[in-house]
Amino acid sequence: MIIRTATGDDWPRIWPFFRDIVAAGETYAYPEDLTAETARPLWMDGHVVVAEEDGVILGSAKMGPNRPGRGAHVSTASFMVDPAAQGKGVGRALGEYAVKWARGAGYHSMQFNAVVETNTGAVALWQALGFRILTTVPEAFESRRHGRVGLHIMYQEL
């Protein structure tokens, strides 16, 4: 598996799993009626990478400053792994890449603003990579399966 910078030509291969993950209603608060055209600028803005193996895109991550201006020394990232590729280390590879990228880009820290508390695999992965839960905003996400659940704010000094 390689992690490489995404190109515009990658979007048609990212969109199917992006659409499915959003439609599942368990991890992202994007509107469910997004089209490929309206979703593209939401994901393909900033430093975007893909995890690819044998020409198949297994997942993607986007990174950049968490806030503009005086908050721009803190980075953030978002991740999507094709459900068909889960359990193959794709999320870990993308997470490790994001942390390394943020360090190399001179960020002071990395903050994830909205990790759904019922996404226990992601929570455990981010903790294994050195993130800690700063707080949980109660009932901040409408999970399709679990109803209203908390959103963790996770943080790591780089």
Language-model features and meaning:
Residues 112-122, 140-142:
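Conserved beta-strand-loop-alpha-helix junction that forms the acyl-donor binding cleft
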Residues 46, 148-153:
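Short hydrophobic/aromatic beta-strand or adjacent loop that forms the aromatic wall/cage
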Residues 127-137:
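Conserved acetyl-CoA-binding loop of GNAT-fold acetyltransferases
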Residues 87-102, 123-128:
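Conserved acetyl-CoA-binding loop-helix of GNAT-fold acetyltransferases
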Residues 8, 27-84, 95-97, 101, ...:
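Acetyl-CoA-dependent GNAT
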Residues 15-32:
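Helix-loop element at the rim of GNAT/NAT acetyltransferase active sites that forms part
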Residues 1-14:
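A short beta-loop-alpha structural element at the N-terminal edge
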